[in-house]
Design a protein with these regions (language model features):
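Class I S-adenosyl-L-methionine-dependent methyltransferase catalytic core
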Residues: 1-219
């Protein structure tokens, strides 16, 4: 995996690669950590992690993975209820990852509303909003909503929109494109993401069709 990245880009993505390798000590890629375990691996000694999961089987697996971990807790709580309840944190700094299952038709609307409620209480926090790209109208509406919220806060926040496609989107086909809205990112992140994504297009794209979108969303 290292050979695919330049000397400039490799240090940027190495922490992530190291986490994945830790779950695959025999070097064959058989296991992939989900976002809670990736987040846990990146915690500093002074950090803590709260994960919310209502699906029983997924929650049990997560509890088992984080058992006896004094820096992490798993709650049987709807994330939409937890989102406004847990912000702002006592530390006043932190990151909120919102990645719903998108099993309901109104999931994009709930994401927009949930983010708005949390952001109103904690506009200085950092947020990651993950979404599948299937309906361009839905993703564009979400991006505009987030841009409006961030731009209207005082002081105004910042946001980035990142989307990555491994193949052209075809109606009723499998998911080939996903996105992130990143609110209040570190100031270096835009350049770092661009460097990484430029080197991921070819190896991850199917038949040379890998593409990414990286921009500041507009209201």
């Amino acid at each position: 995996m290292q050979a695919r990245f330049s000397e400039t880009t490799l240090p940027l993505i190495k922490p992530y690669l190291d986490i994945v390798r830790a779950f695959n000590p025999d070097r064959d890629l058989k296991a992939y950590p989900g976002s809670p375990l990736i987040a846990r691996a990146l915690l500093r000694p002074q950090d803590r992690l709260t994960a919310c999961e209502v699906e029983p089987k997924a929650r049990k697996r997560l509890i088992d993975a984080l058992r006896r971990d004094t820096q992490a807790r798993v709650l049987d709580l709807d994330g939409w209820l937890a989102l406004p309840a847990f912000v702002p944190p006592n530390e006043r700094r932190g990151l909120v990852l919102i990645d719903p299952p998108y099993e309901q038709k109104d999931e994009f609307e709930r994401l927009a509303e949930g983010f708005a409620e949390a952001y109103a209480k904690w506009p200085t926090g950092s947020y990651l909003l993950w979404y599948p790209v299937k309906s361009r109208r839905a993703t564009d509406t979400l991006a505009r909503h987030v841009a409006e919220m961030v731009g209207a806060s005082k002081p105004a926040g910042k946001a980035l929109r990142l989307e990555f496609s491994v193949a052209p989107q075809v109606a009723d086909a499998a998911l080939v494109s996903t996105g992130l809205l990143i609110v209040n990112p570190p100031w270096t992140l835009l350049g770092e993401l661009k460097a990484i994504l430029l080197e991921l297009e070819k190896p991850l794209g199917q038949g040379g069709a890998g593409r990414f979108r990286l921009e500041t969303p507009k209201p």
